[in-house]
């Protein structure tokens, strides 16, 4: 299984581009902050992760303001072939109510 669900804030939102197959593609940099319990002890988690949205979801996210809080779901894949770095491939994204974004999104 390769599924990741995360609450995150949009730190960067790139310009719309298209894949060689002609699909709209949007690169984002997301930041996540949370506190979890690991081995019975609280642990603060702060991370940034590169993400990409393709197709209709890319079009929906293209005007997302920086700082928008979202719930995202997708899968992890290598950033490039044979790379040890990973990228989150978004399959769903929902703006969190009260965030800087306008309407909730569902991909």
UniProtKB/Swiss-Prot annotation:
Keywords: DNA replication, DNA-binding, Primosome. PROSITE patterns: SSB. InterPro entries: NA-bd_OB-fold, Primosome_PriB/ssb, Prisomal_replication_PriB. It holds the Pfam family SSB_1. One of its GO terms (biological process) is DNA replication, synthesis of primer. Residues 1-97 form the SSB domain. One of its GO terms (molecular function) is single-stranded DNA binding. Signal peptide: none annotated. NCBIfam families: PriB_gamma. Homodimer. Interacts with PriA and DnaT. Component of the replication restart primosome. Primosome assembly occurs via a 'hand-off' mechanism. PriA binds to replication forks, subsequently PriB then DnaT bind; DnaT then displaces ssDNA to generate the helicase loading substrate. Belongs to the PriB family. Involved in the restart of stalled replication forks, which reloads the replicative helicase on sites other than the origin of replication; the PriA-PriB pathway is the major replication restart pathway. During primosome assembly it facilitates complex formation between PriA and DnaT on DNA; stabilizes PriA on DNA. Stimulates the DNA unwinding activity of PriA helicase. This is Replication restart protein PriB.
């Amino acid at each position: 299984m390769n599924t990741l669900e995360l609450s995150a804030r949009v730190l960067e939102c790139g310009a719309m581009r298209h894949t060689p197959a002609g699909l709209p593609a949007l690169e984002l940099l997301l930041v996540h902050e949370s506190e979890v319990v690991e081995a019975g002890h609280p642990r603060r988690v702060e991370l940034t992760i590169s993400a990409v949205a393709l197709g209709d979801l890319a079009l929906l996210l293209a005007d997302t303001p920086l700082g928008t809080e979202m719930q995202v779901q997708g899968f992890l894949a290598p950033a490039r072939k044979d790379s040890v770095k990973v990228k989150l491939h978004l399959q769903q994204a929902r703006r969190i109510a009260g965030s800087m974004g306008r309407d909730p999104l569902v991909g």
